[in-house]
Amino acid sequence: MKNYSSHDYLNPAKQATLGFGTMRLPKDRAETARMVDTFLGNGYNYIDTAYIYTNSEETLKEALVKRHPRDSYFVADKLPPWMLKKCPEDCVKLFEEQLRRTGLEYFDYYLVHSLDEGKEQQVEDWDLFGWCVEQKKKGLIKHLGFSYHGGTAYLERLLKRHPESEFVQLQQNYLDNLRGPATEWHELAVKYNQPIIVMEPVKGGSLAKLPPAAEKLLKEYAPNRSIASWAIQYTALLQNVTCVLSGMSNMEQMNDNLKTFEDMKPLTAQEHDLLNQVLNELAKFAGIPCTACKYCHGDCPLNIDIAASFAMYNDAKRDESGNSWNTAMVYKSIPESNRAEACIKCGACVANCPQHIDIPAEMGKVVELFK
């Protein structure tokens, strides 16, 4: 069994380890407790939460904080700028609520959450990094960083302006890195010698559920490996990556990730070629790049289940068996008031989408497909 009790997540030369992302926890808290026990019992200890992850902080209080010694785990939490109306008052109020929700006296890692160009002026005018540094001086934060979803130029400005940031959390996966902008983010982090915590290594599950032709490529090569393990392995081996977060929602996913890290080996040239073949198949699939983070849900005045609508659209488009009518039936089981058809295109959901999706426009595609 591996033991990461003394793992230095701030040392970019260290081999990456597995982190427990809590965005998609099961509703059953007893199941979460079993997952936490298994995670810690296998020597892993980095657990990531956020104020906006539904009941995640409270669940960790029950499943982790009340049941395990404080020196057996690290917790990362986040400051969401878009939920603040004034600083420092709202920062203090939200931070104290996070401590109360988690039952912790301090956070091991704390991030300014989901930064992009739209938050730049707020971050600088309110000196959110400076406020976090003050909490660090008080011992309430041990290590400070930020998570990022913007363009390359702003990422470099952040890295230059804020040397007080000790690490960066980036979306990294073989789809976004090999065919998207994520390689540029990765190169910048390496340039500034920043340790990288990886989020969305499986891109919200979309790299665990590939189109049949793409899945066939990987299964013929390695029939006993899960599809998701390819995505996890790719990100874990990237330079400067010290932790790969996986938003696990059941014990099967937990055990699969543990197996992947236990058997971690560099990808061969043939395996790299296979991933490029998979990407060629994915290029034929015009899906919606939603990762089901649900950051948009709190902004919708009609409580439309945006993530579920996009997931069903992608499932139907991905299905080459001719059974997409099954997905359509499931979609129509959603109450009409929560379906894509109810969207009034107000755009309130758009600003907080980390993937920068034009949600109202994409909802139109959902309506058209399932009408």
Where are these regions (language model features)?
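Glycine/proline-rich, positively charged
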Residues: 24-30, 41, 85-202, 209-216, ...
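Structured C-terminal cap/extension of enzyme domains
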Residues: 41-48, 64-65, 184-371
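Short beta->alpha linker loops
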Residues: 51, 55, 149-150, 249, ...
